[in-house]
């Protein structure tokens, strides 16, 4: 009975925004029609479960804010009606609400804002997966054991009464023969009840084993490196596991690239590369390793699927010294070196190259884990003026955040943690033009900038650090012809 109680409440824990590692929450900065919004989606602890949604509307006379979970397989037509959000006490422009995520797979939270400027909707992609288990607490286990004992005792009492006193007509004595018969029936019922309990425990263990087999984990990436006199070619094969196969759809380009690959040298995180290997098969990617020094690297590969899911594959790779001049396989590849002993903290300014500098406007309050924050940076030219940037992969800037133990990885944009192409695939699915010649018509912007995107050198990345620790942040911009990378470090409380 104790063993049964110990597993009786093992439950699934989902991760939302599994496109990244160690980041449970989704953060989006954008617009819902004419209204500028920030949306934060916090995952539920179980699936099915309720996700917490926080929406901040920064301008406009707002009358209603509705949130709606849209599952990829059913689309908007099969989604439930929107739920009204409620204002946060003491914050006129902040709203809170909860949504049920009922299944594993690709969701989007549709945020509809209505007011004096009309109505508009923002689409925030969310991935819902079972990725862990929670053990039963000792206190609750003890309570369940006591209640189970009471239930078993009650059932045996009912059996004894049914075979004994209940069969005695009114006024007749309950003699020894009837008592022996009642005891015999109770003795027969006891092992049958024990067998039922054993069968229930065995069934639950089978359910738990089946659940473990289907728990989602980051798909395995198998890297191999081929080295000759002039090339260091990295090939990454993504394993199509049973869990991955259950949610798989073809890979689609995000910002014009089939994969965004990041290399971080460990343990000092003193070398960094943002690469774009080509797709040689459905789940095989390859490209040249640039002029980064030899060492052990942690690789993170961002993929976006045609069903709107984004995911990150990861592994380690040992890179030897280059034997000759290395030519990048993609013109948008970029890399940088930053000695691990150099700590460029918030409030500091670092040289980018080509006469440009980048400053982190973060000398104020300390950064607190699990609290929404704005990472603000300013790019200036040689004259000290705020630089005008060129699009780099469709964005004014990209940022990568990695904890010093590599347990946290996130690829950020000024719009937040979401993949832009994931928003696009949900939007075009609503219009009914999801595919063209059997393939998704997505990422129409490719590497160009979004039409309404600011290209100012004043940059803001919305983010929530998931846990305390030391983090390294790489910020990439393109003020001239080449991509420049700044490196910063921060301690999060």
Q: Can you name each region flagged by the protein language model?
A:
Residues 19-166, 173-191, 196-493:
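N-terminal soluble domains immediately following signal/targeting peptides that reside
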Residues 1-4:
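Positively charged n-region of N-terminal signal peptides that target proteins for export
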């Amino acid at each position: 009975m104790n063993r049964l109680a110990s597993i009786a409440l093992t439950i699934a824990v989902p991760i939302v925004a599994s496109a990244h590692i160690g980041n449970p929450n989704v953060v989006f900065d954008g617009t819902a029609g004419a209204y500028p919004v920030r949306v934060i989606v916090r995952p539920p602890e179980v699936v099915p479960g309720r996700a917490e949604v926080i929406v901040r509307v920064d301008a406009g006379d707002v009358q209603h804010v509705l949130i709606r979970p849209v599952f990829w397989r059913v689309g908007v037509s099969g989604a439930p009606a929107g739920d009204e959000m409620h204002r946060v006490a003491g914050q006129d422009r902040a709203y809170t609400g909860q949504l049920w995520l009922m299944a594993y797979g690709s969701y989007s939270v549709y945020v509809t804002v209505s007011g004096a400027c009309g109505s508009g909707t923002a689409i925030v992609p969310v991935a819902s997966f079972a990725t862990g288990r929670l053990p039963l607490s000792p206190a609750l286990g003890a309570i369940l054991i006591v209640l189970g004992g009471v239930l078993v005792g009650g059932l045996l009492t009912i059996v004894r009464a049914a075979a004994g006193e209940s069969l005695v007509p009114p006024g007749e004595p309950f003699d020894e023969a009837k008592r022996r018969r009642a005891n015999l029936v109770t003795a027969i019922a006891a092992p049958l009840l024990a067998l039922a309990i054993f069968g229930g425990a065995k069934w639950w263990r089978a359910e738990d084993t089946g659940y473990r087999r289907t728990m989602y984990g980051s798909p395995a990436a198998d890297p191999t490196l081929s080295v000759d006199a002039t090339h260091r070619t990295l090939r990454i094969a993504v394993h199509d596991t049973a869990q991955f196969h259950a949610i798989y759809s073809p890979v689609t380009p995000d910002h014009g690239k089939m994969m965004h690959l990041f290399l971080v040298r460990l343990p000092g995180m003193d070398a960094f590369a943002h690469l774009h290997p080509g797709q040689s098969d459905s789940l095989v990617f390859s490209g040249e390793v640039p002029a980064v020094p030899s060492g052990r690297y942690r690789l993170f590969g961002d993929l976006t699927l045609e069903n709107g899911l984004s995911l990150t594959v990861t592994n380690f790779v040992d890179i030897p010294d280059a034997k000759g001049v290395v030519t990048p396989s993609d013109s948008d590849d970029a890399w940088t070196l930053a000695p691990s002993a150099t700590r460029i903290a918030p409030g500091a300014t670092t040289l980018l190259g080509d006469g440009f500098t980048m400053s982190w406007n973060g000398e104020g309050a300390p950064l607190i884990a699990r609290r929404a924050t704005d990472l603000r940076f300013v790019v200036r030219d040689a004259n000290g003026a705020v630089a005008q940037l060129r699009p780099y992969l469709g964005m004014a800037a990209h940022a990568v955040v990695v904890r010093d133990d590599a347990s946290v990885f996130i690829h950020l944009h000024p719009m937040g943690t979401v993949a832009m192409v994931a928003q696009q695939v949900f939007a075009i699915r609503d219009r009914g033009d999801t595919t063209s010649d059997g393939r998704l018509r997505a990422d129409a912007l490719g590497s160009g900038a979004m039409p309404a995107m600011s290209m100012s050198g004043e940059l803001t990345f919305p983010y929530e650090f998931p846990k305390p620790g030391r983090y390294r942040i790489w910020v990439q911009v393109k003020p001239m012809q080449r991509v420049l990378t700044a490196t910063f470090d921060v301690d999060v409380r």
